Amino acid sequence: MMNRIITANLANLASSLMLAQVLGWHEPVYPDQVKWAGLGTGVCASGYRPLTRDEAMSIKGNLVSRMGQWQITGLADRWVIMGPGYNGEIKQGTAGETWCYPNSPVSGEIPTLSDWNIPAGDEVDVQWRLVHDNDYFIKPVSYLAHYLGYAWVGGNHSPYVGEDMDVTRVGDGWLIKGNNDGGCSGYRCGEKSSIKVSNFSYTLEPDSFSHGQVTESGKQLVKTITANATNYTDLPQQVVVTLKYDKATNWSKTDTYSLSEKVTTKNKFQWPLVGETELAIEIAASQSWASQKGGSTTETVSVEARPTVPPHSSLPVRVALYKSNISYPYEFKAEVNYDLTMKGFLRWGGNAWYTHPDNRPTWEHTFRLGPFRGQGEQHPLPVDKRYIPGEVKWWDWNWTISEYGLSTMQNNLGRVLRPIRSAVTGDFYAESQFAGDIEIGQPQTRSAKAAQLRSASAEEVALTSVDLDSEALANEGFGNVSLTIVPVQ
């Protein structure tokens, strides 16, 4: 029994079905588009043209494998390609049949289907909904296995692929397999092919943020700082009064479901702003979403005013310090990634393994599904290069297209590759501190005695009667508070 375990990023199959848009001798030619026509030398059906010599050279192995031992088939410009009995020789000549290629190839792109959104829940709930959905999951992956050549992808009580399937929990994953109860008829019909879904991971989508009703406190007065800006000179003085402080933002979140423990963030991102509460929250990358329960951020902020103080006068200065808080329920979408492992014996009458074995080997193959699977890894087979001889080392996608049709494979792979998302929900709370503007009052003339006492000082301007309790402010989240005054130079 032959066993293989191979991993691949099935998302790359989208590019594997991309067809040439503008054809020329230098453009890739995909063998599944080449058709045989027995209409005479160099004659093709409407909408087709003869394959050129250079195009035939690029896919010679595929063409020769489709020809009889002594077959000779025409190409453009009086060239022919000869069958395996002639070692696939390409030379000048004529033939009564022709290899043809479409003038306007049909686009082979995989359709991008709308996201499948699974309701928020614990991890096992999300997985259960995924693997038990017949239309969105069981049938598409079952048909993929069938198209690749796996035998008996269905249960004993239905003649159709992907029906009468049992889903069981196995370790950290799920096993989908045809029901084997009762009798069945057919070679090795009791050996049902299986599809294992495992190795789940979930990646947060920062741009998918949404929130419910917002509860916001508005600004609440914490403390008012007061002082006097005093001018001891005989001339008016323009001054700069500056309040400088470290502003703290404290935040926390709670998660509704345990799925959040398995969700990770791919890149760091800023928590979206909601309401009027000022926040600057950065969520780290490559960490469990549940582990990021909260934190605090600090930034230094300055507020200033530039009043002119009359001679021998004071201007009252006042700054109000506030705090505010906000809370709301939130939701982010999370991309679901997983491994899809097919195992069973391949049909002798036709399978898509690149060697097309006819001895019914048992084969195991793992596709890695999801937008964040396989990124950065060296892919052993660039399947978008299926037109290059020797590059097909796993599945022969040209064969599947020839066997089942381009549109069938497009539709099936589109359904298998449909993005799957669930939701991460919870409640968010944050508190922020901030200062209002510096308010300047009306000038107050200093008494002659006070001016005389100060006349010996070198200071021309100063802050007097300062009411600022640094320790009390620090307890309220305002650190390193200072209030200064300097004359404008």
Swiss-Prot record:
UniProt GO molecular function: toxin activity
Annotated spans, Interaction with glycans from host GPI-anchor: 347-356
Listed Pfam families: Aerolysin, APT
Keyword set includes Ion transport: no
Localization in the cell: Secreted; Host cell membrane
Keyword annotations of the record: Cytolysis, Disulfide bond, Hemolysis, Host cell membrane, Host membrane, Membrane, Secreted, Signal, Toxin, Transmembrane, Transmembrane beta strand, Virulence
Post-translational modification: Proteolytic cleavage and subsequent release of the propeptide trigger a major conformation change, leading to the formation of a heptameric pre-pore that then inserts into the host membrane.
InterPro entries linked: Aerolysin-like_C, Aerolysin/haemolysin_CS, Aerolysn, APT_dom, APT_N_sf, CTDL_fold
Cystine crosslinks: 44-100, 184-189
One GO cellular component term noted in the UniProt record for this chain: extracellular region
Propeptide: 445-489
Primary location class: secreted
Location of region: Part of the transmembrane beta-barrel after proteolytic activation of the toxin and insertion into the host membrane: 257-289
Gene Ontology BP terms: killing of cells of another organism
Domain of life: Bacteria
Residues under site feature: Important for oligomerization: 157
Site feature: Important for heptamerization: 391
Function: Secreted, cytolytic toxin that forms pores in host membranes after proteolytic removal of a C-terminal propeptide, leading to destruction of the membrane permeability barrier and cell death. The pores are formed by transmembrane beta-strands and are approximately 3 nm in diameter.
Domain commentary: The C-terminal propeptide is required for normal protein folding and secretion; it maintains the aerolysin precursor in its soluble form and prevents premature heptamerization and pore formation.
Protein name per UniProt: Aerolysin
Annotated source species: Aeromonas salmonicida
Gene: ash3
